[in-house]
Swiss-Prot record:
Gene Ontology molecular-function annotations: glutamate N-acetyltransferase activity; L-glutamate N-acetyltransferase activity
Name the record gives this protein: Arginine biosynthesis bifunctional protein ArgJ
Record's keyword terms, sorted: Acyltransferase, Amino-acid biosynthesis, Arginine biosynthesis, Autocatalytic cleavage, Cytoplasm, Multifunctional enzyme, Transferase
Source species of the chain: Mycobacterium tuberculosis (strain ATCC 25618 / H37Rv)
Family from the record: Belongs to the ArgJ family.
Length: 404
């Protein structure tokens, strides 16, 4: 693709290795019984190693989350090791020791490879079934393998994106090439237990922009609050949610904070849309927008209430324009409401005006895969948007058999 001067490009064919200064790899370590790729490494070659992260708000945190939160108090990372096929959550002190051993093994392998690295510079992420210990013999052998398989080109990033998948159908990655000649790349996984507080997600973002840890943290927190925290598929919140942002500084370009914020936001927003599109059992991609609320917080609460309502979600699965279920859902939200002021539209077609059904409401066509629900509460200026999906037979089937 030809680069045009003054343009910023967003490319889904690229990921964490699009920015200069990063290598990555994905290998099959044997953690998954299927033999699929299940161990990924993202390595920062520098010259800078600034980093930031945001994590699950679930009080039950997996061992890798506890480890990586400690590591990030330094504001510095050289590497991120990620496994799928096991969450290493609710595994007690032994599970934390496994995480520590993984970081030590990565540090030793990188040092042997030629880059002196300490365990305190290695973030660890895991995803999969909660409650089981990881097969450490396979994982540690895989660490040595993945270090030697690292690529600086796009292939390594693609392999890493595949290796972190669990019930995902497709890998999620994207890169933004800024017109000032610096780049932000990213990869993510997540298909079930998607809810605010990130989204059962592992996400690694990389940039070759020169930025301090505080600048990265500001950009990341703002982006996560506007994107991942507003993706709500099933109301469940994972023990393992982790989003990391690493800077190599290899471009030697220090962007303005506003430019960095915008670039990270655009990458996170695109990854969020990919997560929504590949959610478990999804047949409809749904956007719930609430306007006219007393406050933005009220709008967000109302939008979440609608997005999580099982009757709304099953109606959408059946392409049924059942606006009454939307009103019933929003009526349960603990916010300021006047039922006689509420209006609802589906895909721009009015189905309820001031609390009463609109002519032709039952004939609105919701057969397309994308559905926009807009609810105007009519009591203020607050507004918010939530991404969600329908609730299908496939979702129930997949989650009823996940551990077996």
């Amino acid at each position: 693709m030809t680069d045009l001067a003054g343009t910023t490009r967003l490319l889904r064919a690229q990921g964490v290795t699009a920015p200069a200064g990063f290598r990555a790899a994905g290998v099959a370590a044997g953690i998954k019984a299927s033999g699929a790729l299940d161990l990924a490494l993202v390595f920062n070659e520098g010259p800078d190693y600034a980093a930031a992260g945001v994590f699950t708000r679930n009080q039950v945190k997996a061992a890798p989350v506890l480890w990586t939160q400690q590591v990030l108090t330094t504001g510095r990372l050289r590497a991120v090791i990620l496994n799928s096929g096991g969450a290493n959550a609710c595994t007690g002190p032994a599970g934390f020791a496994d995480t520590h051993a993984t970081a030590e093994a990565v540090a030793a392998a990188l040092s042997d490879w030629g880059t002196e690295t300490g365990a305190i510079e290695v973030a660890v992420c895991s995803t999969g079934l909660i409650g089981d210990r990881l097969p450490m013999d396979k994982l540690l052998a895989g660490v040595a393998h993945v270090v030697h398989e690292m690529h600086g080109g796009l292939v390594g990033g693609d392999e890493a994106a595949h290796a972190i998948m669990t019930t995902d159908n497709v890998p999620k990655q994207v890169a933004l090439h800024h017109h000032d000649n610096w780049t932000v790349g990213g990869m993510a996984k997540g298909a079930g237990m998607l809810a605010p507080s990130l989204a059962t997600m592992l996400c690694v973002l990389t940039t070759d922009a020169a930025a301090e840890p505080a600048a990265l943290e500001r950009a990341l927190r703002r982006a996560a609050a506007a994107t991942f925290d507003r993706l709500d598929i099933d109301g469940s919140c994972s023990t393992n949610d982790t989003v990391l942002l690493l800077s190599s500084g290899a471009s030697e370009i220090p962007p303005a904070q506003a430019d960095l914020d915008e670039a990270v936001l655009r990458v996170c927003d695109d990854l969020c849309a990919q997560l929504q599109a590949d959610a478990e059992g999804v047949t409809k991609r749904v956007t719930v927008t609430v306007t006219g609320a007393a406050t933005e917080d009220d709008a967000l609460v109302a939008a979440r209430q609608i997005a999580r309502d099982s009757l709304v979600k099953t109606a959408l699965f059946g392409s049924d324009p059942n606006w009454g279920r939307v009103l019933a859902a929003v009526g349960m939200a603990p916010i300021t409401l006047d039922p006689d002021r509420i209006s609802v539209s589906f895909n721009g077609a009015a189905v309820c005006v001031h609390g009463v059904g609109a002519p032709g409401a039952r004939e609105v066509d919701l057969s397309d895969a994308d559905i926009d629900i807009t609810v105007d509460l009519g009591v203020g200026d607050g507004q918010a948007r939530i991404r969600t999906t329908d609730l299908s037979h496939a979702y129930v089937e997949e989650n009823s058999a996940y551990s077996s």
